[in-house]
C-alpha cells in the first residue's frame, strides 16, 4: 500500500473515531465538522475531501459503530438463546448512545445505515428466532419480544446514571436491579421459544 493510501486510511479512521466519540455525546444535529476535525487533529476540509461532507462522515461512522457492535456480540455468541450475562449496551456504549442520539435528533437515515448494510443485530436476532421457531416470517410475538429486549437495553444505556442518581442506588440495589433487568430482557424471547 502506498504511503498516500496509508495516510488517507489513517485520516479517515481518525475522523470516524472522533465522530463516533462526539456523536454519542452531542448527537448528529449539534455536531459540527469543525468539532470533529479539531478532535481528530486534522483540517476540516479533509471531511469534505474524504467523505463529501458531514452527512457522508456520519454514514461511515454509524456503519463503523454497527460493525463494531456486531463484532463484539458475535465474539460473545449472542443469540436468542444466549443474550449474555452483561448488558449489551455496556459492551458497545458508543453504538447505543449514537443510535439514541440519532433517534432524538430525528435523523432516522443514520439508524437505517445498520439495516441497509446488513449490520442490524436486532434484525439478525429476529431472523434467528424466526428460524428457531420454523417460521417463514417473524410473528408479532417475535417482533414484540425483540422490541422489549431493545427497549430495556437502550433504556439502560440512556437512563442508568439518572436512575442511580434519582433512586440513590446502592451496590445491593444495583445487583437486584440487574437481576430484574435480565429477567425482563429475556422474558419475551423465552416466552416465544417455549411455545
Residue ranges and their predicted role:
Residues 14, 18-56, 60:
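Helix-turn-helix
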Residues 60, 68-104:
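Hydrophobic alpha-helical connector segments
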Residues 2, 119-131, 135, 155-195:
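C-terminal peripheral helix-coil segments that are non-catalytic and often amphipathic
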